[in-house]
């Protein structure tokens, strides 16, 4: 079993999945992972399916050099976006794997949220391409490692209603406290 970069806060209410040396572009997969971070599991699966069908785009924020603009990126507050099919399919498989792990653990699958997703560079694979005048250039690929951790969403705790017998005291600055003391001394 491999080591994950982050341990979940509540291991009993979370599940994990990972993939190593996946033959999919690192940069596109990084942007895909950042797009689905903190999403509920059901929404993330639906979103990645929509990306493969070009109904929703992946916003490109960090690795966006030369990336064209698309209207679908407006909903994410950016202008550049793409539909990286392979980079959407690999995390989708990992999410399904994590979902089956959660089902095996007896977690409520409908309440799962992507708590942690991380994409790291894997060692580059080297091939060659033949150029004019007998030269050879490298033809590299950039695979990646992906790890996902899902956790059950906690129920939001409502704030207690303020009681009338003890009004909340407002914190005063040092300057105002000094003025109040001065005023009390004069009286």
Curated annotation (Swiss-Prot):
InterPro entries: Ribosomal_uL22 (IPR001063), Ribosomal_uL22_CS (IPR018260), Ribosomal_uL22_euk/arc (IPR005721), Ribosomal_uL22_sf (IPR036394)
GO molecular function list: structural constituent of ribosome
Keyword Ribonucleoprotein: yes
Record keywords, A-Z: Ribonucleoprotein, Ribosomal protein
Biological processes per GO annotation: cytoplasmic translation
PROSITE patterns cross-referenced by the UniProt entry: RIBOSOMAL_L22
Ranges for region Disordered: 155-187
Protein family membership: Belongs to the universal ribosomal protein uL22 family.
Protein name stated in the entry: Large ribosomal subunit protein uL22
Gene: RpL17
């Amino acid at each position: 079993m491999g080591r994950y970069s982050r341990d979940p806060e509540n291991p009993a209410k979370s599940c994990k999945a990972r993939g190593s040396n996946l033959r999919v572009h690192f940069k596109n997969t990084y942007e895909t992972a950042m797009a689905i971070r903190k999403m509920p599991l059901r929404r993330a699966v639906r979103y990645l399916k929509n990306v493969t069908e070009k109904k929703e785009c992946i916003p490109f924020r960090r690795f966006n050099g030369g990336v064209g603009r698309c209207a679908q990126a407006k909903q994410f507050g950016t202008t550049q976006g793409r539909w990286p099919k392979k980079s959407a399919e690999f995390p989708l498989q990992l999410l399904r794997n994590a979902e089956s792990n959660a089902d095996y653990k007896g977690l409520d699958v409908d309440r799962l949220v992507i708590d942690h997703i991380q994409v790291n560079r894997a060692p580059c694979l080297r091939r060659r391409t033949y150029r004019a005048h007998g030269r050879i250039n490298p033809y590299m690929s950039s695979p990646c490692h992906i790890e996902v951790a899902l956790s059950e969403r906690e129920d939001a705790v409502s704030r207690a209603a303020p009681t009338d017998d003890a009004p909340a005291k407002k914190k005063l600055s040092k300057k105002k406290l000094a003025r109040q003391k001065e005023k009390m001394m004069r009286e």
